[in-house]
């Protein structure tokens, strides 16, 4: 099998990025490819805009899962690549095009040369939001083929091609989207005493919420509150009746996440009194921590040291969010970082991963799964 063909597949997928639960063209592309594979050992199920593909083993005693995400981000691409996005305003800026092409490469191998045990390939939509891992896990389709272990990867611009970074235990943080609205009383800019200015209220709240991190969280622990978007008012000479804050909370434990949320809501009650306004929290996506199973991770590290001794890099815990954590909360397994050596970070409009990582990852995963 020519592994370089999956670089071409990546380029085709890169041109049709679609956001969460809108991945219809992506699903159709994947189905078209999978339907051309030898079908003797394959079974395929649709789940919303995603897919579940089972490869029957030759003498199975268990099912091994492999998950890839398939959605893109609402980002306007600025790479200038010949195969850049054809969907204006959308981009595979988090590497899910590489993730899919790698999964297809591994699937292609086992469709013709099945392993001893069953393999389940999960093509999951909506990782970037609103979160597809938890609902697909709760589906009847997944329950019927539920794996005994499950693995996944994520590209990492900061590592070189050929490097794989992993650690037992916590790899990625708990992440919660944060949406806060402030409603007060608008008015003329010349009469501030007759209004309740929500730009002032929201701005003050941004600063005050950071004291939660510095004064309510154990300094030996870690948490981050980030406000990435502020919007308030409509015109420069009118006091804003409403204001909105959008951001994220990231913690290294569910307990710390609970502390942050409790304090935020307590602050909000004080703000309602102090600024004579209404403060409302709106639910967003939650991402459970990616907690690698120690035994499964140790086995993979041993495999790397034996078969790819120059590839293994000890990873550190990161504040990155990934809903693969929901899989690992109920199924043993792990996720690892795959080096792609890009000067631009994940979610950057100029992210351009080195494609040599694709055949390398396919080879590693095939050999690892064959060793199971």
UniProtKB/Swiss-Prot annotation:
GO BP annotation list: diaminopimelate biosynthetic process; lysine biosynthetic process via diaminopimelate
Pfam families reported for this sequence: M20_dimer, Peptidase_M20
Residue numbers annotated as active site: 69, 128 (proton acceptor)
Catalytic activity: N-acetyl-(2S,6S)-2,6-diaminopimelate + H2O = (2S,6S)-2,6-diaminopimelate + acetate
GO molecular function, one term: N-acetyldiaminopimelate deacetylase activity
Enzyme Commission number(s) of this protein: 3.5.1.47
Extent of the signal sequence: none
Pathway: Amino-acid biosynthesis; L-lysine biosynthesis via DAP pathway; LL-2,6-diaminopimelate from (S)-tetrahydrodipicolinate (acetylase route): step 3/3
This protein's record includes keyword Amino-acid biosynthesis: yes
UniProt record similarity statement: Belongs to the peptidase M20A family. N-acetyldiaminopimelate deacetylase subfamily.
Function: Catalyzes the conversion of N-acetyl-diaminopimelate to diaminopimelate and acetate.
Name of the molecule in the record: N-acetyldiaminopimelate deacetylase
Originating species: Listeria ivanovii
């Amino acid at each position: 099998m020519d592994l370089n063909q999956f670089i071409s597949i990546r380029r085709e997928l890169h041109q049709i990025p679609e956001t969460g639960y809108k991945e219809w063209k992506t699903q159709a592309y994947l189905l078209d490819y999978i339907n051309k594979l030898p079908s003797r050992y394959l079974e395929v199920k649709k789940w919303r805009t995603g897919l579940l593909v089972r490869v029957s083993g030759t003498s199975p005693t268990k099912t091994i899962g492999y998950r890839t995400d398939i959605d893109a981000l609402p980002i306007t691409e600025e790479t200038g690549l010949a195969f850049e996005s054809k969907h204006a305003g959308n981009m595979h800026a988090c590497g899910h095009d590489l993730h899919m092409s790698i999964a297809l490469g591994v699937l292609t191998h086992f469709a013709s040369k099945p392993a001893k045990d069953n393999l389940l390939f999960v093509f999951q939509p909506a990782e970037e939001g609103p979160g597809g891992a938890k609902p697909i896990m709760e589906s009847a389709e997944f329950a019927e083929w539920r794996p005994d272990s499950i693995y996944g990867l994520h590209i990492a611009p900061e590592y070189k091609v050929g490097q794989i970074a992993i650690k037992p235990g916590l790899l990625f943080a708990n992440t919660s989207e944060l949406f806060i609205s402030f409603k007060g009383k608008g008015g003329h800019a010349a009469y501030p005493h007759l209004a309740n200015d929500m730009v002032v209220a929201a701005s003050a709240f941004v600063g005050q919420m950071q004291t939660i991190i510095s004064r309510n969280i154990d300094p030996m622990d870690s948490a981050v509150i980030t406000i990435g978007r502020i919007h308030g008012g409509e015109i420069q000479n009118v006091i804003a009746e409403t204001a909105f804050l959008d951001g994220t909370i990231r913690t290294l434990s569910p307990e710390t996440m609970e502390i942050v949320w409790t304090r935020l809501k307590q602050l909000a009650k004080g703000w309602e009194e102090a600024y004579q306004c209404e403060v409302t929290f709106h639910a967003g996506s939650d991402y459970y921590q990616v907690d690698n199973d120690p035994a499964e991770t140790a086995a993979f590290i041993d495999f790397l040291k034996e078969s790819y001794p120059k590839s293994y890099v000890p990873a550190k815990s990161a504040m990155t969010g990934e809903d693969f954590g929901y899989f690992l909360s109920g199924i043993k397994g792990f996720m690892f970082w795959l080096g792609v050596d890009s000067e631009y970070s994940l979610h950057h409009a100029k992210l351009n991963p080195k494609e040599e990582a694709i055949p390398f990852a396919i080879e590693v995963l095939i050999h690892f799964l064959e060793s199971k």
